[in-house]
Amino acid sequence: MAQVINTNSLSLLTQNNLNKSQSALGTAIERLSSGLRINSAKDDAAGQAIANRFTANIKGLTQASRNANDGISIAQTTEGALNEINNNLQRVRELAVQSANSTNSQSDLDSIQAEITQRLNEIDRVSGQTQFNGVKVLAQDNTLTIQVGANNGETIDIDLKQINSQTLGLDTLNVQKKYDVKSEAVTPSATLSTTALDGAGLKTGTGSTTDTGSIKDGKVYYNSTSKNYYVEVEFTDATDQTNKGGFYKVNVADDGAVTMTAATTKEATTPTGITEVTQVQKPVAAPAAIQAQLTAAHVTGADTAEMVKMSYTDKNGKTIDGGFGVKVGADIYAATKNKDGSFSINTTEYTDKDGNTKTALNQLGGADGKTEVVSIDGKTYNASKAAGHNFKAQPELAEAAAATTENPLAKIDAALAQVDALRSDLGAVQNRFNSAITNLGNTVNNLSSARSRIEDSDYATEVSNMSRAQILQQAGTSVLAQANQVPQNVLSLLR
């Protein structure tokens, strides 16, 4: 080996080995201090990517487990509210059983009905006010989607249903004596026809000398106070017929035909209180007369009172629901069946083809095919004002109305079954969430173990590596000192 002083190969070799052992010592210390085998991608590029995917799954599954617990909480909240609704239904059923006993007086039935109404109101309150984190769980049909996995589409649905007295079919539950309810086909009142009032008809009716007259705009008017019909006649020439232009009373037949009596006298002024009509107007009695009629009727078992369902068709061919009516013998009075068993006189409005708000006429079936109508003028009349007090409490009417065959127990049992079905669904979904939580926990444990084997430090190995590196550092430092002394051997050759 040549003796040189410019390059100390032994020193350079020793320094290189010392740097390697120092790097190994640093890596060992980093892994021991962090507990991780992979502290950056350079430690294990593939292992770092795999471990990072495991971390994403583990964090997602951990949150999914918390989501599932939230799902259990909302299901428990809903089920708790349903339990209270069930308690109220059980009490309603108990009261219904009590009301079925014939020993109860009408006063007893009224008291029982009062508590039933309060219980149903409480069911409505629980339904409308029970909420979880701002979500009203029984106020409407709703599907809640709970994320129970780390990936898209891994969900469990909670189907919530609107539960109140109406959806349970109990909003009209009444254990008092009832009116029979049935459907009746009702014929619409006749449409007015002015075909007969052509030129010749107006010539005869007005007593004019020519037949050049016509009905202005083809309109017929009606005065609800005097019960008279009118048309406005106009003439096209400038002869004496012009003086005959104006309003005339006309006759209206049940079939809607409009005619004029010969030589009818023209109205001195435009009639007041008239409105345009397109159908035959045959109003029934006013509320006061209804009261008198009901009071005087003394309805017997052979002449029972019933509730009837009505509808009619307007001039545009639109079918409009006229609601309920109270039928006493051949007379029918427009009414609405209220939740508490009383009845209220109906009001109905609709918009015609020209966009104008019109008074709706409820078609009420009369005796012997006769068609009667009730004019609805925008006012609502409570049955208590029409008959002195609620129809349901009218002695004659209450005794006359045969108790309905409606079975309140069957309706309540159906409501209980509906509540039980939803409670069963909620119980089942809670069990699903519990199962999902258990599975998520197992998966998180297994994935954590897999990730640990990839990125966690093996302390036995790393301590051994650190000890080896430390020894190499100490030895390398000592050897480097010796290697640095080698060039001094050249001095002996120069002496």
UniProtKB/Swiss-Prot annotation:
What start-end ranges are recorded for coiled-coil regions in this protein? none
User: Its principal location?
Assistant: secreted
Q: Name one Pfam family in it.
A: Flagellin_C
Q: Name one GO molecular function term.
A: structural molecule activity
User: Which keywords does UniProt give here?
Assistant: Bacterial flagellum, Secreted
Q: At the top level of its lineage, which domain of life is listed?
A: Bacteria
Matches recorded under InterPro entries: Flagellin (IPR001492), Flagellin_C (IPR046358), Flagellin_C_sub2 (IPR042187), Flagellin_D3 (IPR014981), Flagellin_N (IPR001029), FLIC_barrel (IPR049365)
An example Gene Ontology cellular component term from the record? Answer: bacterial-type flagellum
The answer to whether keyword Cell membrane applies is no
Report whether Secreted shows up as a keyword of the record. yes
> SUPFAM superfamilies recorded for this chain?
Phase 1 flagellin
Family as reported in the entry's similarity comment: Belongs to the bacterial flagellin family.
Function according to Swiss-Prot or TrEMBL: Flagellin is the subunit protein which polymerizes to form the filaments of bacterial flagella.
Another remark in the UniProt entry says: Individual Salmonella serotypes usually alternate between the production of 2 antigenic forms of flagella, termed phase 1 and phase 2, each specified by separate structural genes.
State what protein this is by name.
Flagellin
Species source reads: Salmonella paratyphi A (strain ATCC 9150 / SARB42)
Give the organism's phylogenetic lineage: Bacteria, Pseudomonadati, Pseudomonadota, Gammaproteobacteria, Enterobacterales
